[in-house]
Amino acid sequence: EHPVWVKAWYLNPETFKSAPLFLLSTDLPENDYVSQTITHRLYDANVATKVAQFILLGVGGAKLMDELNFNPGLYHLNEAHGISAAFYLDKKYGNKEEVKKRLVFTTHTPEEAGKEKHDIQKKKKMGYFCGMKLDEVRELTGMAGDQFNHSLVALRFAKLANGVSQLHGEVSRNLWKKFEGICEIKAITNAQNWHYWADKQLY
């Protein structure tokens, strides 16, 4: 565990008539070589790199909002890769219920095998939990074993989750119903019809 410097790139909405976009990079001379490579590949197969990317996405993204003096009423996690943000927000707000008021989660992967799980000790060693003790992490998340299940933790931290179609919502509810303490999983259909979602400037 050591500090990693992060640079935020900003894409102005006027460039492509899009929403504002922030991109995070660790490829900076202030970082050692290993830290510089955290953002070199998307979905890196190396577990330590992947955990570092998840810290950057979740904790880094939430910290960026604070650095920019934004005060989001809601944090939306599109898949569970950024759930480390919940531990940053727990530290910021002081309790899980305050985090739950501000967190929603979209789940995509309907297969149990596709849910990310990593060694909880490794995550603790890498600073994933923002300095929280492991027994506190276990109590907060309900994770009793050695494997940290990102999607399950996201479902326990969020006030609401959604699947990406009616059928997927049903499949997701069946997949997770055996677990205690999860939020409601609704369904929002991903629309591909431009009449529903595209800005007029795009067509």
Residue spans for each PLM region:
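Catalytic cores of carbohydrate-active enzymes across secretory and cytosolic contexts
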Residues: 1-203
